[in-house]
């Protein structure tokens, strides 16, 4: 049987977790085997910016960061489960990638 590998990425971990719980509910309702959600390492994108625009005075810095959270879910590729997966309301700042594997 084919497996569907679902990769979720987003900057807000709470939204990523809500999408994971929706996928888990679909797997329980349809009765397919599910592995995950497996938390992958969080990427931290850090941008240091100089506070003073003119370069005079002491060098003080602001550090801005954005964290990218990732989750990996494997489940059996049942037709009913995949149809319900396509109808999930996914927030705009979360990307979802589904790959079918043998």
Swiss-Prot record:
Keyword Iron: no
The keyword Ribosomal protein belongs to this UniProt entry's keyword annotation: yes
Highest taxon, organism lineage: Archaea
Cited InterPro entries: Ribosomal_uS10, Ribosomal_uS10_CS, Ribosomal_uS10_dom, Ribosomal_uS10_dom_sf, Ribosomal_uS10_euk/arc
GO MF annotations in UniProt: structural constituent of ribosome; tRNA binding
Keywords annotated in UniProt: Ribonucleoprotein, Ribosomal protein
GO biological processes: translation
Any one cellular-component term (Gene Ontology): small ribosomal subunit
NCBIfam families in UniProt: uS10_euk_arch (TIGR01046)
Family affiliation: Belongs to the universal ribosomal protein uS10 family.
HAMAP family (UniProt xref): Ribosomal_uS10
Assembly mode: Part of the 30S ribosomal subunit.
PANTHER family assigned to the protein according to its UniProt record, in alphabetical order: 30S RIBOSOMAL PROTEIN S10 FAMILY MEMBER
Protein name from the UniProt record: Small ribosomal subunit protein uS10
């Amino acid at each position: 049987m084919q497996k569907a590998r679902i990769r979720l990425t987003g900057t807000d971990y709470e939204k990523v977790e809500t999408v994971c719980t929706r996928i888990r509910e679909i797997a329980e309702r349809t009765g397919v085997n599910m592995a995950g959600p497996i938390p992958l390492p969080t990427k931290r994108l850090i941008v240091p910016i100089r506070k003073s625009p003119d370069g005079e005075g002491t060098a003080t810095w602001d550090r801005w960061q954005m964290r990218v959270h990732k989750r990996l879910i494997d489940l059996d590729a049942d037709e009913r489960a995949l149809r319900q997966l396509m109808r999930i309301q996914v927030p705009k700042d979360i990307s979802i990638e589904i790959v079918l594997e043998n």
